[in-house]
Amino acid sequence: MGSCFSSRVKADIFHNGKSSDLYGLSLSSRKSSSTVAAAQKTEGEILSSTPVKSFTFNELKLATRNFRPDSVIGEGGFGCVFKGWLDESTLTPTKPGTGLVIAVKKLNQEGFQGHREWLTEINYLGQLSHPNLVKLIGYCLEDEHRLLVYEFMQKGSLENHLFRRGAYFKPLPWFLRVNVALDAAKGLAFLHSDPVKVIYRDIKASNILLDADYNAKLSDFGLARDGPMGDLSYVSTRVMGTYGYAAPEYMSSGHLNARSDVYSFGVLLLEILSGKRALDHNRPAKEENLVDWARPYLTSKRKVLLIVDNRLDTQYLPEEAVRMASVAVQCLSFEPKSRPTMDQVVRALQQLQDNLGKPSQTNPVKDTKKLGFKTGTTKSSEKRFTQKPFGRHLV
C-alpha cells in the first residue's frame, strides 16, 4: 500500500487492461434524475447545478481515520481509495463501524490530467441518477486536496470476481455473470439515451462495482464526454481508454461515438464468458489479446463452448453460453454501424436472463450455424473480422 502515500502520476494516456485497482479506481457514481444540465461540462470548474455535498478536508480525514494505511481499499494511477464512515442524516464524520459506509478517493497532488478527470467525474456523476451507476455523495476541493466520496460497494470490482484466484475470490456463478452483464448494459444504455447522451469511454471489469447483493454499477467517469450519438462521431486527437477494450476505429483514427462503447462492452462479455482478461501478457503470445484468441472459436455454436470458463462446470446450459457469445460477436463488429445499440443489447440479455435454466427445443451444440465471425485472410494491419448485422433476434 506504500504507493498510496507517494507522488505518482499517470504515465500514459492509455493504460493496459491488467488493473490492480481493488475498487475499480476512480470509483464512481450517479445523481440528479434522468435529466442532465444543459451547461457545458467544462474542464475548469464544478457546475453550480451539481447537487452533491462539498466536504472539508478535515471532515474526510476524520471519516477515514486520518487516511490510515489500514483504511485503504483500493489504489491506482490517480490515487487511493479509503474506507470511511458518515452519519446518515447529517453526512458528518462518525466513529468507525457506525452510520453510512463510504469510499473516499484521494487524488494524487501531481498531474493536471488527473485534475481534469476529477472534475469530469463530479460534473457527470453529480448530474446523473440510475440504479446501475455508483452514487457520488460529494467531493472536497481545498487547497491542493482533491477528493471524491462515493457509496461503498461491498463486493468490490467485477475484475476481482472474474480473474482473481484464491480462497477469498470464488469464481462468480453463471447466473450472477448474466445478472452483472445485464446491469452493466442497462447503465451504459442509460448513458447513451436521450437526453443524457454520454459516451463512457472506459467500460472494463475493474470499473464495474458490485454491492452486497451483487448488483452491478458503472464507476469511474473520468474519461466520459458528451455525445454524439447515432452515426455521428468525434475525431479525438488524444486517444484515451484501456488497451484490449478500445474499439479498432477509435484506436486507429480517433473516431469516437456510442458504438465505440458497444465494442468495449463486447470485450467485457467475452471476459464474463471466458473468465480471461481482455489483455494478459502472461498468456502465450497468440493468446494475449482475448478478442484475437477467441475469434476462431466464435465461428460456430459448437466451438464457442470451448471458450467458456471451465470453473463454471455444469452451471449453465449450452444455449445460454451461445446466446451471450452471440451478443458479444455482434458488439465486436469491425464496422461500427453494424454493432447493436445498447438498448438492443439490454433486450437480448434480458431475454437470456429470463430464460436461464430453461432448455430450448433445439440442441445448439449440434447446430453449427455461424454465429457471425468469418474466418479467412485479411490485412494484418486491420485485423478485420466481419459478421452478420444485428437483426431482430440474436439467435
From Swiss-Prot:
Q: What positions belong to coiled-coil segments?
A: none
Locate the Phosphotyrosine modifications and list their residues.
Y150, Y168, Y214, Y243, Y250
Q: Where is this cross-link: Glycyl lysine isopeptide (Lys-Gly) (interchain with G-Cter in ubiquitin)?
A: K31, K41, K95, K170, K186, K286, K337, K358, K366
Task: Please note every region of biased composition (Polar residues).
Answer: 354-365
SUPFAM superfamilies assigned = Protein kinase-like (PK-like)
CDD domains, alphabetized: STKc_IRAK
Entries under InterPro entries matching the protein? Kinase-like_dom_sf, Plant_Ser_Thr_Prot_Kinase, Prot_kinase_dom, Protein_kinase_ATP_BS, Ser-Thr/Tyr_kinase_cat_dom, Ser/Thr_kinase_AS
O-UMP-serine modification sites? S236
Q: How is it modified after translation?
A: Phosphorylated by SIK1 to be stabilized. Phosphorylated by FLS2 and BAK1. Autophosphorylated. Autophosphorylation is reduced in presence of the Xanthomonas campestris effector XopAC/AvrAC. Phosphorylated, especially by EFR at Ser-89 and Thr-90, in response to the microbe-associated molecular pattern (MAMP) flg22. Phosphorylation in response to flg22 is abolished in presence of the Xanthomonas campestris effector XopAC/AvrAC. Phosphorylated at Ser-233, Ser-236 and Thr-237 by PEPR1. Phosphorylated at Tyr-150, Tyr-243 and Tyr-250.
User: How is activity regulated here?
Assistant: Kinase activation is repressed by the phosphatase PP2C38.
Lipid sites, type N-myristoyl glycine: G2
- What job does this protein perform? Plays a central role in immune responses. Required to activate the resistance responses to necrotrophic pathogens, including the regulation of defense hormone expression (e.g. jasmonic acid (JA) and salicylic acid (SA)). Phosphorylates FLS2 and BAK1.
**Name of the protein this chain belongs to:** Serine/threonine-protein kinase BIK1
Annotated source species: Arabidopsis thaliana (Mouse-ear cress)
Q: Which gene encodes it?
A: BIK1
